[in-house]
């Protein structure tokens, strides 16, 4: 709320004096890398914009949301989750450093969800750890210019670009190896819990390709057909891990 008020002051937007109260309710699983905390901030910003009839450009909203989490709540994170929540679509994000410095935000490209391959999501029903724990040491090493971390981040960006190019070209079914490469690289620089690694290995044992959705506790992957999806379900049977097919619109 304070960040919204500060933004309006900066933009010389006069807010009418009227009262409100905010109550939260969420069905997003906690601490499994599904951006539950940022969803609350995003929803609050959206409510404030509607209530006060203030228009904030879509490309600016993720920056504002992240500033709340980083500066007010001390959470180390990036813009990705906030971009998706603001745009509410499938989006390719370019965070090129020069571009970010020049325009103050990334370049966000909407992708037709009809071009996506078959996707599944699996998540743990027991609690994992918060993303602030997962990201803190890596962020610090990146800020310090650790060559290994800087190089890894370049590769993550390259994987995303290659996946985007395949999807836009109508070859979305070919992105599987890029998901595997993403996870393998992440595993090489982060300390991952055995339970989270087990999720990926179970999905791979069924022939699927997958990666974390976020900081751990949930994975997103691709599968070829219903036979493979059923094999994935069997791989997670009796583990307390739920598997579903996301509806992307």
Roles of regions detected by a PLM:
Residues 1-64, 203:
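Anion-binding (especially nucleotide phosphate/pyrophosphate-binding) glycine-rich loop
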Residues 1-16, 25, 63-76, 80-211, ...:
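C-terminal nucleotide
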Residues 217:
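Conserved glycine-rich beta-strand-loop-beta hairpin in the small C-terminal domain of fold type I
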């Amino acid at each position: 709320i304070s960040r919204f008020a500060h933004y309006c002051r900066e933009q010389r937007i006069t807010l009418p004096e009227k009262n409100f109260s905010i109550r939260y309710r969420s069905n997003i699983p906690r601490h499994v890398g599904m951006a539950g905390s940022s969803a609350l901030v995003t929803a609050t910003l959206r409510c404030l914009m509607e209530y006060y009839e203030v228009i904030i450009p879509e490309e600016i909203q993720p920056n504002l949301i992240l500033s709340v989490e980083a500066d007010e709540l001390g959470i180390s994170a990036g813009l990705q989750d906030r971009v998706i929540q603001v745009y509410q679509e499938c989006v390719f994000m370019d965070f090129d450093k020069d571009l970010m410095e020049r325009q103050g935000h990334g370049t966000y490209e909407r992708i037709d969800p009809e071009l996506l391959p078959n996707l599944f999501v699996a998540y743990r029903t027991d609690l994992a750890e918060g993303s602030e724990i997962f990201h803190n040491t890596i962020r610090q090493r990146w800020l310090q210019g650790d060559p290994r971390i800087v190089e890894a981040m370049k590769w993550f960006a390259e994987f995303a670009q290659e996946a985007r190019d395949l999807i836009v070209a109508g070859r979305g079914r070919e992105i599987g190896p890029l998901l595997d490469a993403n996870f393998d690289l992440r595993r090489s620089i982060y300390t991952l819990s055995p339970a989270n690694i087990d999720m990926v290995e179970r999905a791979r044992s069924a022939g699927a390709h997958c990666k974390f959705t976020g900081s751990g506790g949930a994975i997103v992957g691709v599968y070829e057909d219903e036979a493979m999806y059923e094999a994935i379900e069997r791989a997670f049977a009796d583990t307390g891990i739920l598997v579903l097919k996301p509806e992307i619109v």
